[in-house]
Structure formats: structure tokens, C-alpha cells
Amino acid sequence: MIFQRTVKEMVKTTGVGLHSGNKVTLSIKPAPVNYGIVLVRTDLEPAVSIPAKADQVRETTMCTALVNDDGVRISTIEHLFAALAGLGIDNALIEVDAPEIPIMDGSASPWVFLLQSVGIQEQSAAKKYLRIKDTIRVEDGDKWAELKPFNGFRVDFAIDFNHPEIARSQQHMVMDFSTSAFVRDISRARTFGFMRDIEYLRANNLALGGSMENAVVLDEYKVLNPDGLRYEDEFVKHKILDAFGDLYVAGHAIVGEFCAFKTGHALNNQLVRALLAQQDAWELVSFEKDEAPVSFSVPAGAVFA
């Protein structure tokens, strides 16, 4: 049986909020089986809990944000959630003392390191996967995203940026998910932005914590970061990283193929909502270890500390 997972013990870190520029402290704590991922705003009195569910995603401009019925928000969850998804963590209590998750270096890599350093604990209940039975598709103009049946988790993703540096890079990628492939090929890809947008955002008191320490920054012609790119195709890989995080608010790892063209946070969330609403298009399944699709098989000692 493949079992549910949580962290072995509490781990804490500090960072900067991308939009506020303020210091943020975040803790990740173990949680019991079938708990899911729950985030808590500890800076409020009383503290406010928000479960990481698709219908709690109510803001998708520049990031993915959970917002409860009272308007309490936790923004920029996608990179942390990509790490949780990539390492197969089902249950965790995440406490944060600000309205946004710290941006760290703009990728999922610091979260992967944090989670692997504290260790991942198998629990005493079967892990449930969301298996796609029928194709679900959403569109917005020429942008689209779909989930369709596949025995594993495959991503087929394309971007289309009219920028010389991005156009020179590979803008299409197909990958079969595994934890090792995620950590090696996806987790280090950083968010990227354009100088012209950053100037506008800062004029509106946004992106105040953004810098070349936590983003790939481009002018009209080139990458401005002195050290350049981490991957030749870092742009499409970061969009895949975002999608991993955005899809994880489905509540379970997905068994299926995710295909997308020019999608972003809004369309990713629309896809998850459309999927969950069409209950005959999916089923929850568990696997014996020797029966699991290769995407979800865990090599001995690869993740658990």
C-alpha cells in the first residue's frame, strides 16, 4: 500500500513577502491522516484557518491566493504547494504570520530542501489519488488547459511569449512526473517578470519584495540577472511548477495527463473546479506499491529521511 505522508516534525523558516516586501515567518507542522493541507494566519486574533481547497482560491492575479468568506487571504501559495505535491505530502498544518507566503528564491527549491531536511513521515492510512476518467477542458481565448486519462501523471505544456530571450528557449515541454524528475528538472525554475511590469506594480505598491534574488528579470531584449538562467528552458519549467502547485488544491495527487497552452493561475484553478464539479469524470483510488504507476513509485530512501 502507498500510504499518506506528512512531515516528521515542525520546521520553520523566514523570508520576504513578494508583494509587501515585509518579513514573513512560516512553520510547517505534522498533521493527522485525512487532514489535508490547512493554512493558518497566526498574525490575526483569533488565528484564522483556511483549508487548501479549490473553492477557496478566489484571487489569481499574479499569484494564487486562498481567501475565506470573511476576506482573510493567504497569497502566493503556488511554489510551496508545488513542493508539497512534488514530494507527495498529503497532510500538513502551515502557519504564517502575514497575508502571503514568503517568496524565497522564486522557485520551489527552498521548500523542497526544507521539507526533505526535516524528513517525511509515512502514515497509517492509504494515500488517495484522483484518477481522471473523462477529459475535462477549459478555455479562455487562445489559452486552454485540460486533464485526460493517463496511467501516471504526465504534463504536456507550451507557452508562447513574444520576447527574444524566451523565444530562443524551448517553450514546449513534455514530462512524466516522478519525485526525482520534479526535484531535478522543475523545482529550481524561478518566477520571471519584465522590467516594464515591475515598474508599474511598484507604483501600485505591489512586488515591493521582488528582486533578482527571487525572480528572473527581463528587459525588452534579454535576461538581466548576472548569473543568467538555471535551466535553458527555465521559463516553461516555471509555468509547469506553478501548475503543479495550482492543481494540488484538488486535494489529491492526480492520475492523468495535464495538457496546457499559455495557461496561468486563473485557468489552472478553473480546470480544477470544473473537474471536481463533474463527479463522474474522476474517482478516488489507492495503490499497492507494486501496482502504482511509475510516476508515484518511490525508490527506497529517495524521499524519506
From Swiss-Prot:
Binding locations of Zn(2+): H79, H238, D242
The protein's annotated pathway: Glycolipid biosynthesis; lipid IV(A) biosynthesis; lipid IV(A) from (3R)-3-hydroxytetradecanoyl-[acyl-carrier-protein] and UDP-N-acetyl-alpha-D-glucosamine: step 2/6
GO biological process: lipid A biosynthetic process
Known cofactor(s): Zn(2+)
Keyword Cytoplasm annotated: no
Catalysed transformations (reactions): a UDP-3-O-[(3R)-3-hydroxyacyl]-N-acetyl-alpha-D-glucosamine + H2O = a UDP-3-O-[(3R)-3-hydroxyacyl]-alpha-D-glucosamine + acetate
Molecular function terms from GO: metal ion binding; UDP-3-O-acyl-N-acetylglucosamine deacetylase activity
InterPro entries per record: Ribosomal_Su5_D2-typ_SF, UDP-acyl_GlcNac_deAcase, UDP-acyl_GlcNac_deAcase_C, UDP-acyl_N-AcGlcN_deAcase_N
Enzyme class, broadest EC rank: hydrolase
Active-site residues (renumbered): H265 (proton donor)
EC number: 3.5.1.108
Keyword annotations: Hydrolase, Lipid A biosynthesis, Lipid biosynthesis, Lipid metabolism, Metal-binding, Zinc
GO cellular component terms attached to this protein's record: membrane
UniProt keyword Lipid biosynthesis present: yes
Origin superkingdom: Bacteria
Function: Catalyzes the hydrolysis of UDP-3-O-myristoyl-N-acetylglucosamine to form UDP-3-O-myristoylglucosamine and acetate, the committed step in lipid A biosynthesis.
Family the entry assigns: Belongs to the LpxC family.
Protein name: UDP-3-O-acyl-N-acetylglucosamine deacetylase
Species assigned in the record: Shewanella woodyi (strain ATCC 51908 / MS32)
